[in-house]
Amino acid sequence: MKIYRVGGSVRDELLGLPVKDQDYVVVGATPEEMVRLGYRPVGKDFPVFLHPETHEQYALARTERKIARGYKGFEVYAAPGVTLQEDLARRDLTINAMARDEAGDIVDPFGGIADLQAGILRHIGPAFVEDPVRVLRVARFAARFGFQIAPETLELMKEIVHTGETEALVPERVWQEIAHGLMESHPSRMFYVLRECGALARILPEVDALFGVPQPAHAHPEIDTGIHVMMVIDHAASKQYPLEVRFAGLTHDLGKGTTSPDEWPRHIGHEARSVELVMGLCERIRVPGESRDLALLVARFHGDVHRALELRPATIADMLQATDAYRKKARFQAFLQACASDFHGRPGFADKPYPQKEHLSRALQVAVDVDAGAIAMQLNQSHAGKADLPMRINRQVYAARVERISSLLSHL
């Protein structure tokens, strides 16, 4: 029985990056032996065990054989006779197929170290095409490390897309990989790779449709809507904004992809169209509620936020109400972060001031200080009829908030 540390932890260690999760492969053991040694079985599809003390994962060496479409269509074979090299050979990329033995020596049968040094993402063998998730993973690694994709690997990615394997991806896995990619330091790289191999048009056609759609040059020097959206998510990443903000940045302009070419470069009404497309995309790939809800708000209101300095107090109060800012203050700040990223995501705009963000934050601050409870109590004591009391309370609270915002703006 021999134990090897494998995969991402070995890769990251060689790159000088922090090592998070550590995975191990056990060669020459049976499930019964592992249990006798105190390991706890947890794997459903293949033998995986948790270490009795560290609780890290230890998997028996295994091979896989494709028997059906999709990333779950594999038959797994695990036995004491499976070698380390056979186990490593089933992995996706050379940089992920290295191991470190108990003496600390590196086992690198496929040239992973050389590819790390050269900054290359290269597949191991022809079995790469059997798992469509690998298209998403390679794109994500490109965003993480900034590595180039080997030409032959890119060709196999195109083959996976062409054969329709990506259609078999379950929605939850698509979202999982997209979310991971958005959280990388340069998320745009993931989407450019997906577009280059044809996968973006299959899994996120609404985003793919943005490329080649022009915008007014005076407001968008980058012209291309797809490029703009990529700049938006990269700006959000540079500010280390959370996933919800980055996803909202990715989807805020989806409606521009449906503008008739006769109307280019203007996109009148694209906000309403964006809302509809965001909802459909979120339903299709099972986007969690927090990311979906923020994306819908940003799609609908980002134009109003950009015009915030010109808005009347009542219009600002209406926006605060419509975005549920009084109850969800943290989400409203994320909303403003996404709108600011939209502004900054243009050539030459990264360091320009965006006073709208502070303007609306201060408006919320003064409006939220209105004591709705005191207003309700006063009306309850002075108003004989109770039938329309809730409506009267809402009107008074709204009026008080508008007055507070108006007072604020008069002093700016």
Swiss-Prot record:
Which amino acid positions bind ATP, per UniProt?
Answer: 8, 11, 91, 137, 140
Q: Which InterPro entries match?
A: CCA_bact, HD/PDEase_dom, HD_domain, NT_sf, PolA_pol_head_dom, PolyA_RNA-bd, tRNA_CCA-adding_enzyme
- Source taxon at top rank: Bacteria
Q: Which GO terms describe its biological process?
A: RNA repair; tRNA 3'-terminal CCA addition
Please give the catalytic activity noted in the UniProt record: a tRNA precursor + 2 CTP + ATP = a tRNA with a 3' CCA end + 3 diphosphate; a tRNA with a 3' CCA end + 2 CTP + ATP = a tRNA with a 3' CCACCA end + 3 diphosphate
Q: Where do the annotations place Mg(2+) binding?
A: 21, 23
Which EC number applies?
Answer: 2.7.7.72, 3.1.3.-, 3.1.4.-
Q: Name one GO molecular function term.
A: ATP binding
A Pfam family that the UniProt record links to this protein: PolyA_pol_RNAbd
Q: Which cofactor does it need?
A: Mg(2+); Ni(2+)
* Matches recorded under CDD domains: HDc, NT_ClassII-CCAase
SS bond partners: none
Tell me how the cofactor is bound: Magnesium is required for nucleotidyltransferase activity. Nickel for phosphatase activity.
Family annotation (PROSITE patterns): HD
Arranged from A to Z, the UniProt key words for this protein are: ATP-binding, Hydrolase, Magnesium, Metal-binding, Multifunctional enzyme, Nickel, Nucleotide-binding, Nucleotidyltransferase, RNA repair, RNA-binding, Transferase, tRNA processing
The residues the record assigns to binding CTP are 8, 11, 91, 137, 140
Task: List, for all copies, the residue spans of the domain called HD.
Answer: 225-326
Entries under Gene3D superfamilies matching the protein: Beta Polymerase, domain 2, cca-adding enzyme, domain 2
Q: Which PANTHER family match?
A: MULTIFUNCTIONAL CCA PROTEIN (PTHR47545:SF1)
- Quaternary structure, from the entry: Monomer. Can also form homodimers and oligomers.
Entry text on domains: Comprises two domains: an N-terminal domain containing the nucleotidyltransferase activity and a C-terminal HD domain associated with both phosphodiesterase and phosphatase activities.
General function of this protein = Catalyzes the addition and repair of the essential 3'-terminal CCA sequence in tRNAs without using a nucleic acid template. Adds these three nucleotides in the order of C, C, and A to the tRNA nucleotide-73, using CTP and ATP as substrates and producing inorganic pyrophosphate. tRNA 3'-terminal CCA addition is required both for tRNA processing and repair. Also involved in tRNA surveillance by mediating tandem CCA addition to generate a CCACCA at the 3' terminus of unstable tRNAs. While stable tRNAs receive only 3'-terminal CCA, unstable tRNAs are marked with CCACCA and rapidly degraded.
An additional note in the Swiss-Prot or TrEMBL entry is: A single active site specifically recognizes both ATP and CTP and is responsible for their addition.
Similarity-based family: Belongs to the tRNA nucleotidyltransferase/poly(A) polymerase family. Bacterial CCA-adding enzyme type 1 subfamily.
Put simply, this protein is called Multifunctional CCA protein
Native source species? Nitrosomonas europaea (strain ATCC 19718 / CIP 103999 / KCTC 2705 / NBRC 14298)
